[in-house]
Amino acid sequence: MSGKRVVVGMSGGVDSSVTAWLLKQQGYEVIGLFMKNWEDDDDSEYCSTRQDWIDVVSVADLIGVDVEAVNFAAEYKDRVFADFLREYSAGRTPNPDVLCNAEIKFKAFLDHAMALGADTIATGHYARVREAGGRFELLKAFDHTKDQSYFLHRLNQAQLSRTLFPLGEMPKTRVREIAAEIGLPNARKKDSTGICFIGERPFRDFLNRYLPTKPGPIRTPDGKTIGQHIGLAFYTLGQRKGIGIGGSRDGNGDAWYVARKDMAANTLYVAQGHDHPWLLAHTVHADDLSWVAGHPPAEGTQLAAKTRYRQADAPCAVTRATGDALTLTFQQAQWAVTPGQSAVLYDGDICLGGGIIASTEAASLEQAVA
């Protein structure tokens, strides 16, 4: 690969640092690019942007690559954060990492890299790209425990054709070993968590800065009022902690879970017990679809899906896939399927794409106990 120029998204973390080193070893001309996609945190105790940039520069000096910083804060707010707030305001629970990958890391970043004369880009994501018959497939990572294809399912053929995922073929333990072996200064740095580019702030405090609170009743499925919520945007389906109603009511010690939101009545419904029927769904409807191959799978196809990150693949049938509407029917009832999250389809290790969960249909009693 001598002479090929690759621009690597370097975050200051171990994964992107090892990615840059591996590509340098393979003969690529490597340029590191540090993305700053959030502006309002420079004085925050939760901000790590400055330290991340210091780590990027230290790694670049050690492995001998050029590095520069680019500010995509305006693009992030317009393309990702505005949608994030709209979804929460509508009572849904979005996954901004999915949109951030499609709009920032593999669009704004890719465009910038091409302007730098890059032949390709690379990131530290755990996933794989395979060319087959002139088309590109997105595959799960070799290390399924770290697989990030769920977050990448909106990537298209043009994006995948210009993308490398060097870590996709190795376990995370080996990445840490390489970092230590070559003496990376961030070899022991913990993996980042929290919302994409927003960090590890207490989420409720962060959201409260942008969305107004509108308290309302908390009710049980039979309509009994048992508390007051602070605003529907601050709760998500399946949530157990932080509801504020205690752990035992109606003579039953089972935990309470957020089960439904009635936006029109500003009412939060909670159900008692992990396997309450209100928490189970057999059919999932999604829209805002995106397919890696550019077209949906055929109706009637038996596949598997994830309706949240780190969920085990769940067998399902594609019962509708026309236009911008997708319906999945699962063999077994799925727990706390949440509107706003992504439903992502897989054929074995191949990630086909998916869409944003719009609504669900409750499981029957037989399906609920299966």
From Swiss-Prot:
EC category name: transferase
Positions of region (Interaction with tRNA): 146-148, 308-309
Pfam families reported in the protein's UniProt record: tRNA_Me_trans, tRNA_Me_trans_C, tRNA_Me_trans_M
Residues binding ATP, per UniProt: 9-16, 35, 124
Region (Interaction with target base in tRNA): 95-97
Localization per Swiss-Prot or TrEMBL: Cytoplasm
Cellular component GO terms held in the UniProt record: cytoplasm
Annotated GO MF terms: ATP binding; tRNA binding; tRNA-uridine 2-sulfurtransferase activity
Main location, first listed in the record: cytoplasm
Gene3D superfamilies: Adenine nucleotide alpha hydrolases-like domains (2.30.30.280), HUPs (3.40.50.620), Translation factors (2.40.30.10)
Cystine pairs: 100-196
Active site feature: 100 (nucleophile), 196 (cysteine persulfide intermediate)
Any GO BP annotation: tRNA wobble position uridine thiolation
CDD domains: MnmA_TRMU-like
Catalytic reactions on record: S-sulfanyl-L-cysteinyl-[protein] + uridine(34) in tRNA + AH2 + ATP = 2-thiouridine(34) in tRNA + L-cysteinyl-[protein] + A + AMP + diphosphate + H(+)
Family: Belongs to the MnmA/TRMU family.
Protein name: tRNA-specific 2-thiouridylase MnmA
Lineage: Bacteria, Pseudomonadati, Pseudomonadota, Betaproteobacteria, Burkholderiales
